[in-house]
Structure formats: C-alpha cells, structure tokens
Curated annotation (Swiss-Prot):
Source organism of this protein record: Nocardioides sp. (strain ATCC BAA-499 / JS614)
GO molecular function: ATP binding; DNA binding; zinc ion binding
This protein's name: Transcriptional repressor NrdR
Cofactor info, note text: Binds 1 zinc ion.
Protein task: Negatively regulates transcription of bacterial ribonucleotide reductase nrd genes and operons by binding to NrdR-boxes.
Chain positions of all zinc fingers (unnamed): 3-34
Length: 172
C-alpha cells in the first residue's frame, strides 16, 4: 500500500474493522516514513461468470436494468428497484464466493422481485426461465397462487346488547 502523502510503500495497519455489513473492510494505516495516518477501504470484487465462459464485474445497475424492463408500466418506484438491487447484491455477497455464475444472479433476483410485484416477477421469470408456451405461464401462476399465504376470513359476530340508559347532563 502506497502512502498517499509521500508515496512510500512501507505502511503499517493500526486497526481493521468490518464495514457496510461485511461488504468492506476499513483499515487505519500509518506510514513508516512520514508518520502520517490514512484510511483505506477494501471491497470484495464480485465477478459474474457468464454462460459463454467470459467473466465480468458484478454491477448492481446492470441487475436492476433487467428488472426495470420487467417492471415497465407497473407501480414500482426507483427506490424500490434500488432496494431490490441492494438485496440481490447482499445475497450474493453473503454466499462468500468471489465468482458467481450468472444463473445465481438470476435466482437472487427472483425472490425479492416476487415479493415486490408478481406481474413483474412473471415477466422476468418468463425470460429468465425461457418460457415456451402459455402452459409455462399457467404453471408459474399456479405455483404463485399455491404459495400465497392463506387469508382466513372468520365471520365477525357482534354480541347483542341492550341500549345504555341515557346519562344525566350536568348543567352548571
């Protein structure tokens, strides 16, 4: 690590702390030549392994761009898309692997998108899973319906009560 003040390569770590919920490491350093202190932040680089064999750095923006297309015309805000992108990145980082297959990125998107908007989920899933017929859509919709939490509607009973006697009005 080069000192930002004198460019000396001999620096010493004074303190290391995990930051951003484990997404980065913050290190406090000192230079042995000029004795100045500085802070560095180290991020784990996520790499996506494409089906073609090529690899590229993971970018939250690219993941959100694909979801944005599925959400077109739906009541989904940019803030919600940003939160979804963060959730996807957090899920991928939680695994701890530096290289992630593109397939895993798609799987990480499906869960949060399903909770956000079912129609957008179906649109994204139809491309991601390469739906070939209406039957594929019907199967996915049936699965969505089956996994929805059952809402139990219980009849409300109101106990019969006698009207309360009128209360005297205080004048004064």
């Amino acid at each position: 690590m080069h000192c930002p003040y004198c460019r000396n390569t001999d620096t010493r770590v004074l303190d290391s702390r995990v930051a951003d919920d484990g997404g980065s490491i913050r290190r406090r350093r000192t230079c042995s030549a000029c004795a100045k202190r500085f802070t560095t932040v180290e991020l784990m680089q996520l790499t996506v392994l494409k089906r073609s064999g090529a690899s590229e750095p993971f970018t939250r923006e690219k993941a959100v761009a694909g979801v944005r297309k599925a959400c077109k015309g739906r009541p989904v805000t940019e803030d919600q898309l940003a939160c979804l992108g963060q959730a996807v990145e957090d899920a991928l980082r939680l695994d701890g692997a530096a290289e992630v297959p593109a397939h895993e990125v798609g799987l990480a998107i499906l869960g949060p998108l399903r909770e956000l908007d079912e129609v957008a989920y179906l649109r994204f899933a139809s491309v991601y899973r390469a739906f070939e017929s209406a039957d594929d859509f019907e199967d996915e919709i049936a699965m969505l319906r089956a996994e929805r939490p059952a809402v139990a509607i219980e009849p409300v009973t109101v106990p019969a009560t006698e009207p309360a006697p009128p209360q005297p009005v205080a004048t004064g």
